[in-house]
Amino acid sequence: MSCSKSMVLGYWDIRGLAHAIRMLLEFTDTSYEEKQYTCGEAPDYDRSQWLDVKFKLDLDFPNLPYLMDGKNKITQSNAILRYIARKHNMCGDTEEEKIRVDIMENQIMDFRMQLVRLCYNSNHESLKPQYLEQLPAQLKQFSLFLGKFTWFAGEKLTFVDFLTYDVLDQNRMFEPKCLDEFPNLKAFMCRFEALEKIAAFLQSDRCFKMPINNKMAKWGNKSIC
């Protein structure tokens, strides 16, 4: 790794909002270490590992994930991604690329949160059919936006590809056939997974494929599907 002083990424010991960040750190050869917090078991789901230090880290808006890079202390997962991406010119070059990045950053997070809300809802099983019914229409929008481009900003890889891969992969795990109607999305997933540093990370013990969510979730809360 290239940097002499490691960044510190703080998050729960799950995939969650940190997967795209971890992949971007790995892809950019950024030296980093993780501070992982563990949520307790049912029924209390004790979060004291994090809550005991939450307001002692000099964070402006204390939350997980956080990234510490020397004097720079950042929360909000997309702000962290942008911070890393700016260091490596991965936010888009042209105005068109930057616009597409801005759109995708927000659109994919809206999409992510729909699945998150479902997974943590106590009525998960009864609400699941409704989610699956509307899923193809949402995926079609992403397919049309990608079109014939290689990446979601165009022909240049940007940080939103890391976000989008993560969210599409979670949906693919939730409904394995959901991408079958969208060859360009499937091709995007294959291209991303074939990036040398991404392929190595996904096969490493540093990668959290599961659990996606924390222990109180109704889906994605265990180490295997």
UniProtKB/Swiss-Prot annotation:
Keywords: Cytoplasm, Phosphoprotein, Transferase. One of its GO terms (molecular function) is protein homodimerization activity. It is found in: Cytoplasm. One of its GO terms (biological process) is xenobiotic catabolic process. Residues 94-212 form the GST C-terminal domain. Belongs to the GST superfamily. Mu family. InterPro entries: Glutathione-S-Trfase_C-like, Glutathione-S-Trfase_C_sf, Glutathione_S-Trfase, Glutathione_S-Trfase_N, GST_C, GST_mu, GST_superfamily, Thioredoxin-like_sf. The N-terminus is blocked. Homodimer. Glutathione binds at Y11, W12, W50, L51, D52, V53, K54, N63, L64, Q76, S77. The modification Phosphoserine is found at S6. It catalyses: RX + glutathione = an S-substituted glutathione + a halide anion + H(+). This is Glutathione S-transferase Mu 5. SUPFAM superfamilies: GST C-terminal domain-like, Thioredoxin-like. Residues 5-92 form the GST N-terminal domain. Conjugation of reduced glutathione to a wide number of exogenous and endogenous hydrophobic electrophiles. One of its GO terms (cellular component) is sperm fibrous sheath. It is an enzyme of class 2 (transferase). The keyword Cytoplasm applies. It comes from Rattus norvegicus (Rat). Substrate binds at Y120.
